[in-house]
Regions:
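Conserved alpha/beta-hydrolase
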Residues: 60-82
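Short beta-strand/loop motif that positions the catalytic acidic residue
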Residues: 160-161, 166-169
Length: 257
């Protein structure tokens, strides 16, 4: 079946500077949707940047959500172009503060319901941030791990409790696939493990599997219908939005290279 995904006017992406709890200043891309009550934080992979999320960010913004995509410390516009940056081991766990600063930014703008989506270490960081913040309402984890540079997730998924979470991993990405399998068994709320084939790792899967962007968007928007018939979260409340069709059935979407 098809469920409507609401669409509304979005503002162009803007560059902002966020300050974390330890005083680190980081760059972030923001796509604001006017009067949005829902928002999403998007967190990139190691060696990548906020721009990896540009297409998904625009889609979410046009669907009525405000979006913040931070550059993690030592990444993106936080460092000179083509610089050879060595990130201290102790800084990896501190990167959860970038997620927290992004969540705070959205709440300060009036967003009431914040979700997080991350890829690879970004998935780990989102899960850890949500474990510490019971007001984060929803998660999407692309290629999560169990422990990367001290950013652990098994205890975090248990602390996350009964909130919704979407796991996505490709069978050819053995470590992430096994990690997601472990985490899925420990999740206690609404959950789905989307298994892809030959789709690679992290945000690369969004390029290699045409159905994935629609699944992620509908999960974050709360229009995804589980096989039980339940919706993942409340529908967006923008009464003046224009509907567009997005596939949101509870069946596994077909995977493509």
């Amino acid at each position: 079946m098809l469920l409507p995904l609401l669409a509304t006017a979005a503002l162009a992406a803007t560059d902002v500077t966020l300050q974390t709890e330890d005083g680190t200043k980081v760059h972030a891309l923001v796509e604001a949707s006017k009067d949005a009550e829902k928002g999403v934080v998007l967190v990139h992979m190691v060696g990548r940047s906020a721009s990896d999320w540009s297409y998904l960010s625009e889609k979410l913004s046009r669907s009525g959500q405000s979006v913040v995509a931070p550059d993690l410390r030592g990444h993106g516009k936080n460092v000179p172009e083509d610089a050879d940056v060595e990130i201290p081991d102790e800084d990896w766990a501190k990167m959860v503060q970038e997620v927290q600063a992004s969540v705070k930014f959205l709440r300060d703008k009036g967003v009431k319901e914040v979700s997080c989506a991350g890829a690879s270490i970004g998935a780990n960081l989102c899960l850890r941030a949500a474990a510490e913040d019971p007001e984060i309402v929803n998660l999407v984890l692309l290629s999560p791990g169990l422990n990367y540079k001290g950013v652990k997730t098994v205890d975090a998924i248990q602390a996350y409790g009964d909130r919704p979470v979407l796991f996505v991993a490709s069978e050819d990405d053995n470590f992430a696939f096994r990690s997601a399998s472990v985490l899925e068994t420990k999740a206690t709320g609404q959950r789905k493990f989307q298994i892809l084939k030959n789709a690679g790792h992290g945000t690369k899967m969004l390029n290699r599997d045409p159905g994935l962007e629609g699944l992620v968007t509908s999960w974050l928007m709360g229009t995804y219908e589980l096989s039980s018939g339940q919706l993942v979260a409340p529908r967006p409340r923008n009464a003046e939005a224009v509907a567009e069709d997005v596939k949101t059935t509870g069946e596994k979407l077909q995977s493509h290279q």
